[in-house]
Each structure stands twice: as C-alpha cells, then as structure tokens.
C-alpha cells in the first residue's frame, strides 16, 4: 500500500542554529557546531568537545510551566515541532487532527529522564 507523506513545515534546534533560518544560514556559511563542553565539568573525562545547543530559551519558545517538566532535549524537540507547525501555516480548525502528525528526531536523550517523567505523568497527569 502506497501512502503519501507531505512535508509542510520545518523546524530546527541544532548546535549551529535554533531555528530553520539560523540553521540553514550556518550550514551555508560552513559554521561548525562542535566546541568545548560547557554544560558540565569535563575534568574527569577524556572527551572535552561536543555539539551543544547554545542560546536556547525555553521561555521564548513554549509554555514555561510545561518546559519545566522537560529535559532540555525534549524542550528542543517541542520547540522545533512548534516551529515546523507554524511554518506549515495550517489552520487546524479546518483540518482533521487525526490526519496530521509531527515527526520528531533527536540525536540522543536521557532515557532515565524519560522513564522518570513518564511515571510522573502517569501519577499526576500532564
């Protein structure tokens, strides 16, 4: 069975840009997103470099109350999905919500945090 998939919007939170526009501009300019690790003390580790997301503000990109319950990687995914949805310019009041979806990709996330937060949501609700 063949099914059509239509990409209608794009969103990005990356080490070289926190929006699609910033990302593409950085890619065209050949910017590198790898640099010294700043999120934690690396003195006990051999690896000192990473591709960290910089300058991201959850307050500016989503409901902050919801963001406080998320790990940073989830905040990045939600912000990128929100940007993609806005980029699509679809009026969902005119669409069947069961025929729409968002594909989210993340290089890695905290599985422990996913488990912990899943349990919290089950117990307390979203």
Give residue ranges: language-model regions.
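Conserved "HGTGT" condensation-loop signature of ketosynthase/thiolase-family condensing enzymes
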Residues: 1-126
């Amino acid at each position: 069975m063949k099914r059509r998939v239509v990409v209608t919007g794009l969103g990005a939170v990356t080490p070289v840009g926190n929006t699609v526009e910033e990302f593409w501009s950085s890619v065209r300019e050949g910017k590198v997103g790898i640099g010294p690790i700043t999120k934690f003390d690396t003195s006990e580790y051999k690896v000192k470099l990473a591709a960290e997301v910089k300058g991201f503000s959850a307050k500016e990109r989503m409901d902050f109350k919801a963001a406080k319950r998320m790990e940073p990687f989830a905040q990045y995914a939600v912000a990128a999905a929100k940007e993609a949805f806005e980029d699509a310019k679809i009026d969902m009041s005119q669409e069947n919500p069961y025929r729409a979806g968002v594909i989210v990709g993340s290089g890695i996330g905290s599985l422990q945090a996913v488990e912990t937060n899943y349990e919290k949501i089950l117990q307390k609700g979203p």
